[in-house]
Swiss-Prot record:
Palmitoleoylation is required for efficient binding to frizzled receptors. Depalmitoleoylation leads to Wnt signaling pathway inhibition. InterPro entries: Protein_Wnt-8A/8C, Wnt, Wnt8, Wnt_C, Wnt_CS. It comes from the Eukaryota. Its main location: secreted. GO terms for cellular component: extracellular space. Disulfide bonds join 55-66, 105-113, 115-133, 181-195, 183-190, 260-298, 276-291, 313-328, 315-325, 320-321. Keywords: Developmental protein, Disulfide bond, Extracellular matrix, Glycoprotein, Lipoprotein, Secreted, Signal, Wnt signaling pathway. This is Protein Wnt-8c. The gene is WNT8C. Ligand for members of the frizzled family of seven transmembrane receptors. Probable developmental protein. Is likely to signal over only few cell diameters. May be involved in the regulation of axis formation and in the rhombomere specification. It is found in: Secreted, Extracellular space, Extracellular matrix. A lipid is attached at residue 187 (O-palmitoleoyl serine). CDD domains: Wnt_Wnt8a (cd19351). One of its GO terms (molecular function) is frizzled binding.
Length: 357
């Protein structure tokens, strides 16, 4: 039993150690465990990894940028937290695992799973019927739940929050699914369509959950009942709090720090030394403001550094059949957050106190 538990804890890639390239090798944790776990473990690992990569993309220009040290979410971790950021990590990891299991099921990677054809032949709407090969999200949801939710063995508030946010991630996969259709009819008239459901691009799920992160709900617990030491009273307070929370809403318990300052014990690296964006093509308004958010509002200055970038250029096709390119060097201006005079920095941070992350 302990071996199976260790496999579950190891395989779900929401721990910092798992993000290490060497530790990420599936072979590292296929030493034990039931056959069912061995069947799906590589998909679970790949799904958790894709969730972490999406987290880093979504928070790339935020003060908290999804660092590896912040992803050690074991409920047995003494430093575990229940912040807004933790809620997103649980949701995106859970979504990544479900997404990959569902996709690999449709690709025929598992003997025990195939398309969801349960609705095939039924009328779906005016001019179309269910058919084709719908992605089997019920399968992905069921297996991902076995792996991801097994991390939470406790019954305390933090464990319940983590389980809730795991479910938000799984519901996000369902909420973003797309209907795809194929036309049928004489001479391409499309008099009737056959339609099926397919997974959205994972980036869309990331965007959806980022929106949920921005709208996340802070739980206000009855602290007197929580401190009373009565487990039944504590469970009652928790149940009452969750009664008003929607199933698709991310929740958190603790306010986040400003993430400006380095705190090694908590795994916060601060923003000093981080790159930020000021100029460039196709930058969003949020990206253009990254220097203000990461530097100015954190009491740092923006420092421009010129970096040499080497790229292939002047490529030509030679018969037959190679492409030869030259190596071009170009100086590119990049901007970084740097320390400024202490007095100026303290004045700036006081002035910007209260700004949103």
């Amino acid at each position: 039993m302990r071996g199976s538990t260790f496999l579950l804890l190891s395989i779900v890639g929401i721990y910092g150690a798992i993000l290490n390239a060497a530790a990420w090798s599936v072979n590292n944790f296929l030493m034990t465990g039931p056959k069912a776990y061995l069947t799906y473990s590589s998909s679970v690992a790949a799904g958790a990894q894709s969730g972490m990569e999406e987290c880093k993309f979504q928070f790339g220009w935020e003060r908290w940028n999804c660092p590896e040290s912040a992803l050690q979410l074991s409920t047995h971790n003494r430093l575990r937290s229940a912040t807004r950021e933790t809620s997103f990590v649980h949701a995106i990891s859970s979504a990544g695992v479900m997404y990959t299991l569902t996709r690999n099921c449709s690709l025929g990677d598992f003997e025990s799973c195939g398309c969801d054809d349960s609705r095939n032949g039924r009328v779906g709407g005016r001019g179309w019927v269910w058919g084709g090969c719908s992605d089997n999200v019920e399968f992905g949801e069921r297996i991902s739940k076995l792996f991801v939710d097994a991390l939470e063995t406790g019954h305390d508030t933090r464990a319940l929050i983590n389980l809730h946010n795991n479910e938000v991630g799984r519901l996000a996969v369902k909420a973003t699914m797309k209907r795809a259709c194929k036309c049928h009819g004489v001479s391409g008239s499309c008099s009737i369509q056959t339609c099926w459901l397919q997974l959205a691009d994972f980036r869309e799920i990331g965007n959806y959950l980022k929106m949920k992160y921005d709208q996340a709900h802070k739980l206000e617990m009855d602290k007197r009942r929580m401190r009373a030491g009565n487990s039944a009273d504590s469970r009652g307070a928790t149940a009452e709090t969750f009664h008003h929370v929607h199933s698709t809403e991310l929740v958190f318990l603790e306010d986040s720090p400003d993430y400006c300052t380095r705190n090694a014990s908590l795994g916060h690296h601060g923003t000093e030394g981080r790159e930020c964006l000021q100029t460039g093509k196709n930058l969003s308004q949020w990206e253009r403001r990254s220097c203000r958010r990461l530097s100015t509002e954190c009491g740092l200055k923006v420092e421009e550094r010129r970096t040499e970038v080497v790229s292939s250029c002047n490529c030509k096709f030679h018969w037959c059949c190679t492409v030869r390119c030259e190596q071009c060097r170009q100086l590119v201006a990049k901007h970084f957050c740097a320390r400024r005079d202490a007095a100026v920095a303290n004045h700036t941070k006081r002035r910007n106190k209260g700004h949103r992350r």
